[in-house]
A protein has these predicted regions:
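Catalytic beta/alpha-barrel core
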Residues: 79-80, 94-108, 117-130, 141-152, ...
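Glycine-rich, proline-tolerant flexible connector loops at the mouths of alpha/beta enzymes
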Residues: 28-41, 59-81, 245-259
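Catalytic alpha/beta core domains of metabolic enzymes, predominantly
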Residues: 138-245
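Active-site-adjacent loop and "lid" segments of alpha/beta metabolic enzymes
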Residues: 74-82, 95, 118-125, 181-188, ...
Length: 291
């Protein structure tokens, strides 16, 4: 079985490449939960680009064109595939930011891969072999969310499906484990365990504080714990931190309770970079488990 790459470099069409893994400085995957409009996407991308430049850190712009697993059938899902793809291309061309979005079916993979740099596999779909193989076949980098039901060591088989299909540019992303009803917990051991697979490891700090279905027809969340868990994950030595952010989370169409206000993102990112600098200095990011 082919092994995953320890380092992923996003270079295509970018003046400033973004490097994930291999002991390099952390990368942020950041943006609003769902794409609300072209204007909103461009405005948030512009602000994140300015933060990227000020902090000298790589940021991958993320947003979802379709929230396909909302709690309620009446909940807002996003602007849809056809409307979103040219906006992703415009964000990259205008702001020199690589982009990431979710795919939910094999049929979406080729079209989405023409517009974004990273395909993301949702946690609920992380064991769907046909979806993983279709995503792998695009040749794009793949970020796989670990299912809330999955042990960290089980991600080895998930990663092997993509790497074994000939695409070594794959990341494992922790987003919390189910702990009773409407609750997730983050087991920091899992980050070190997944690093032993050999691929870059991402920590999703915002979905880890989600309370799935906790508000009846939508999910709740505890955004005050995002910095707490993010600091812990960076101290463990993750390669990237995933943070959903919005200028007005309390009025966002989805995942508002666990999104970080955009005007607080830069301070949080700067703090996490300081933790990451220490992790690099101490060799934590490349240290084997038990060493």
């Amino acid at each position: 079985v082919n092994r995953p790459n320890a380092v992923i470099e996003l270079t295509e069409g970018l003046k400033k490449p973004v490097v994930i893994g291999g002991g390099h400085r952390i990368t942020f995957i950041a943006g609003p939960c769902q794409m609300q409009s072209r204007q909103h996407a461009l405005e948030t991308a512009h602000q994140l680009k300015e933060i990227s430049d000020r902090l000298n850190v790589g940021i991958i712009y993320k947003t979802s064109f379709d929230k396909a697993n909302r709690t309620s059938a009446t909940a807002a899902r996003g602007i849809g595939l056809e409307a979103a793809l040219p906006i992703f291309q415009e964000i990259k061309a205008t702001y020199d930011l690589p982009t990431l979005t979710d795919v939910h079916s094999e049929a979406q993979c080729v079209g989405v891969a023409e517009a974004v740099d990273v395909l993301q596999i949702p946690a609920f779909l992380c064991r769907q072999t046909d979806l993983l193989l279709a995503a792998a076949a695009t040749g794009k980098a793949i970020n796989i969310k670990k299912g809330q039901f999955l042990a960290p060591w089980d991600m080895k088989n998930v990663i092997a499906k993509v790497a074994g299909a000939g695409n070594p540019n794959v990341m494992a992303c922790e987003r919390g484990a189910s702990f009773g009803y409407n609750t997730l917990v983050s087991d920091m051991r899992g980050l070190a365990i997944m690093r032993e697979i050999g691929c870059p490891v991402v920590f999703d700090a915002t979905h880890s504080v989600q309370q799935p279905g906790g508000q009846g027809t939508s999910s709740g969340g505890q955004r005050e714990f995002v910095p707490v868990l993010a600091r812990a994950a960076v101290a463990v030595g993750v390669d990237a931190v995933f943070i959903e952010t919005h200028e007005d989370p309390d009025n966002a169409p989805s995942d508002g309770p666990n999104m970080v206000p955009l005007n607080q993102f830069e301070a949080l990112a700067a703090e996490l970079i300081a933790f990451d600098d220490l992790a690099i200095k101490l060799g934590v990011k490349t240290r084997q488990l038990g060493a």
